[in-house]
Amino acid sequence: NIEQAILSSPDRLVMFSYAHVPWINKRQLLLEKSGLPDNHEKQTMFDTAAGLLHKSGYQSIGMDHFVRPNDELSIAMQTKKLHRNFQGYCTRRTTAQVYGLGVTAISQLESAYAQNTKDIPHYIKTISKGELSITKGYALSPTEQLTREVIVTLMCNGCIDWRDLSKRLHVSVSTLKAATAYDEKKLSGFADDGLIY
């Protein structure tokens, strides 16, 4: 449990929600016999754990990471150099691209994603021939690349500074807003509920 994790005094902790995908992993069907927590129960577990971590001196990084105040992720967040890839939060200094090595591994490149085969014999055969063993790939359009940057910035900083982001990406604010279909009027309900300001 979280109290035991805190006692071991790690520098970082990450809390991900359990992914129940029995159509991929048939063994997970066994868990359904015991019952799985609903969304409200999962949120309560997360909130309880986050509260205990905060009381123990950890600070939240983004949506699911908790670190000591002197951790490089904390420093990156304070200096707006925090980044996130599909594996979690990291510093921009350490995150240009992610290269997936091995069966089912996923690569995240500047303008594309690729996944290696799930078939071990096929993977060994193609790699032995000096070939890549990619079975799925997706090339991001320029608009999708902009959208990804806006989403990552929001996930890392909790806000969007359109002017700062436009300077960093060398595009206009109107281009960024168009890429994300940004419409301030559509956000008014969230503001009314206190979710954004």
Q: What do the predicted segments below correspond to?
A:
Residues N1-L176:
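C-terminal scaffold of the Radical SAM
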Residues T180, E184-S188:
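Short, hydrophobic-biased segments on the C-terminal half of alpha helices
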Residues L187-Y197:
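A short, conserved structural fragment
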